[in-house]
Amino acid sequence: MTLNPTRRAALAAPLLLGAAACSQEIGERPLRGADTHAAGYPTVQAVDHFGELLSERTDGRLRLRNYPGGQLGGEGDTLEITIFGGLDVNRVNLAPVNVIEPTTFVPALPFLFSSIDHMRRSLDGAPGRVILESLRPHGLIGLCFYDSGQRSFYNRLRPVRTPQDLAGMKIRVQPSDLYVAMVRALGANPTPIPFGEVYQALVQGVVDGAENNMPSYDDTRHHEVAPYYTATGHVMAPEVFVMSQRTWDRLTPADRDLVMECADESVPYMRDLWDAREASSREKVIAAGCELIEDVDVEPFRALMAPVWEQFITTDLQQRLVRDIQAME
């Protein structure tokens, strides 16, 4: 994962701040966090809640300053900054993490989870703990998973009910080889574009559609320019909340336990927010006149994913995790 020159220059100030901060003792400055979602989004509120709990339980000694809305760059950028200690904590989607750790391909597999409940039980259990632990060799401490809902396709051209309806469409995907392969297997043209640039790409016809969850579809105003939403629910990949190993190593054992405790408690808080947000977002996009196709037969989509699974699930550990998750259905 390497920053391009333009992005590197734009993020030089936060990086320098991070380097200077490393010389300070934990508690002399706020912990810094980042999120590409806007203030008020469930993941942002969950991380803020984590910070509030941490501050309350340390009488303000450990506190958090969170930077939402992509203020410090895209997720790939902020993940790299976190690895090098310029950020202390970070909420990112699994897509940029896929780039550095193949174990994280498992929960991002299309049609792996049969329901949100299945996903939550799997990630709260042993499979989730193994996946979080796989981040440690990369300079990251996996704290917890947050919901990212069910990703579905939406576009500006026509209703989609079958994979054939996607044929030839330019579909924005996250910068992940797995997502590229998934969309290509459906006969569409995958187009990696940073999250913050998708609205203009839809307006200008750079892409015809994208895939994301309902709250993101609403929150980004993508529904204004891409009114056809097909509820395929093809991916239920979670968000992951991480801490820099460099920050973790400077915490006392008691503070590490407290960080994990507060992160764990932020999960049900986030899920309650998420469930409410999904319902309200659905109502909003319907009121805006969008066409929601919720009775789609997903089996033809699922049938095309076998080669994608074969391409990305190649290690014994990945295969064991898939079996363990399927057994929890």
Map each language-model feature to its residues:
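N-terminal secretory/targeting leader peptides
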Residues: 2-4, 12-18, 22-117, 127, ...
